[in-house]
Regions:
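N-terminal secretory signal peptides that target proteins for export/translocation
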Residues: 1-5
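Short sequence/structural segments immediately N-terminal
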Residues: 21-325
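Bacterial N-terminal signal peptides
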Residues: 8-19
Length: 325
C-alpha cells in the first residue's frame, strides 16, 4: 500500500508539473504572438508576399522560446510603427527600394547564428561576405520551403549568381547536380563541395584543399602510392575541371593533348611510335602527323596515352613507375 501511495503521489506530481509547463509554454506563445501582432495587424495574409508563412518555419515556431519575433530581425522600428512610410530599421526584401545594407542584414542574422554558437561558420572575411552578399540573398526566411536547403533546388539558387557554372554543369561530363531542364535525379548539391558560410580552404571548399575535397568521394585516388604522379599530388585541377567538361571524366582537354602540356618531348622509349603501322610513321609523341602520314597511330586512338598508362593517378605495383600496371 505504501508503495502504491508513493507511485500515486509521483504520478500526480508529474501530471501537475506537465500541466504547469504546458500552461507556461502557452503563456509564452501568446506573449510572442501578441508582440508580433503589432506587425501582423498590417502585414497580414492580404500582402502579395507571404508574410505569415514564417509561422510554418522554425523561425516562426512560437512554441520554441529561441524563435525570434518580427522585431528581433527587423529591429524595434519605432519610426515605422508611428509612420508607415518610414522604413523598418532593417529591410531584407531584395525588391524593396529601401533595402538595408548587407552588413546590417547580416548583423541581424549573426545576432543568433553566431560563429561561437555554430563553429561551422567562417562568415566574416569569406568571399561571400567580402563581396557584399547577405544571408537573405540565399535564404528566404519567410518561406516554409527554402530552395537553398533542398537537394532538388539548391543548385538553382547558387546559379542565380554563378552563371558560368550553370553553363558548365550542362556539359557532357559533369557532376550529377539537379538542374532545371535536366531530368536525372540529383546525387550531389553544391554544398557537398563548397561551404557558402566561409571556409579555410580556397573557393569556399569544405576541406582545406582541392584534393582533400575531391578525396571525400574519390577515395580510391587518395593513395599513398608507391609511384606518385606529381600533377595528381599537386592538385586535381591540373587535369580536371570540376563543374563540367566536353571531355570524358571532367578532363580539361582530352589525351594526348592534356598529357602533352607536361610531357612535351619525344616519347621516352619510342615504343608504339607507329613506325610499323604503315606509311608516314611518326616517331615522336608531339608529331601528330608528318608529311604523307595516313595511318592511325596507336598513341592517338581511343584513350591515347591512357591505353598504356592506365593507372595515371598512381601505382602500387613494383614495376609501376610508368603507371602501366
Amino acid at each position: 500500500m505504501v508503495r502504491l501511495s508513493r507511485l500515486g503521489s509521483l504520478s500526480a506530481f508529474i501530471l501537475l508539473w506537465a500541466a504547469a509547463a504546458a500552461a507556461q509554454q502557452g503563456a509564452a506563445v501568446k506573449a510572442a504572438l501578441a508582440a508580433d501582432e503589432v506587425c501582423t495587424t498590417c502585414h497580414n495574409e492580404t500582402w502579395a508576399k507571404p508574410i505569415l508563412a514564417i509561422y510554418q518555419t522554425p523561425h516562426g515556431n512560437r512554441a520554441d522560446p529561441r524563435a525570434p519575433g518580427c522585431r528581433s530581425c527587423h529591429g524595434p522600428s519605432e519610426g515605422h510603427l508611428s509612420d508607415f512610410n518610414t522604413s523598418p530599421d532593417v529591410v531584407f526584401g531584395a525588391a524593396s527600394k529601401r533595402l538595408s545594407r548587407a552588413e546590417a542584414r547580416n548583423a541581424a542574422c549573426l545576432a543568433c547564428h553566431d560563429s561561437k554558437v555554430l563553429p561551422r561558420m567562417n562568415w566574416i572575411g569569406s568571399q561571400h561576405e567580402s563581396h557584399g552578399i547577405a544571408c537573405t540573398s540565399c535564404h528566404n526566411i519567410h518561406a516554409p520551403d527554402q530552395k537553398v536547403l533542398s537537394k532538388a533546388t539548391q543548385a538553382e539558387v547558387c546559379f542565380a549568381c554563378h552563371k558560368a557554372q550553370r553553363a558548365q554543369i550542362r556539359r557532357m561530363s559533369a557532376h550529377p547536380l539537379a538542374v532545371t531542364g535536366i531530368g536525372s535525379p540529383p546525387k550531389m548539391v553544391c554544398s557537398d563541395c563548397h561551404n557558402p558560410h566561409g571556409s579555410t580552404g580556397p573557393a569556399l571548399l569544405v576541406k582545406n584543399s582541392v584534393n582533400e575535397t575531391c578525396y571525400a568521394c574519390h577515395a580510391e585516388k587518395r593513395g599513398p602510392f608507391l609511384w606518385e604522379h606529381s600533377p595528381v599530388v599537386d592538385s586535381c585541377l591540373n587535369c580536371h575541371t570540376p563543374h563540367g567538361s566536353t571531355n570524358a571524366s571532367l578532363l580539361k582537354t582530352r589525351a594526348p593533348f592534356l598529357c602533352q602540356e607536361c610531357h612535351s618531348g619525344d616519347h621516352a622509349a619510342q615504343i608504339n611510335s607507329g613506325a610499323n603501322l604503315g606509311t608516314g610513321a611518326v616517331t615522336t609523341i608531339n608529331g601528330l602527323q608528318q608529311a604523307g602520314a595516313a595511318a592511325t597511330r596507336a598513341q592517338l586512338a581511343a584513350r591515347a596515352c591512357l591505353n598504356c598508362h592506365v593507372l595515371i593517378h598512381g601505382s602500387n605495383h613494383p614495376a609501376g613507375a610508368k603507371f602501366q600496371r
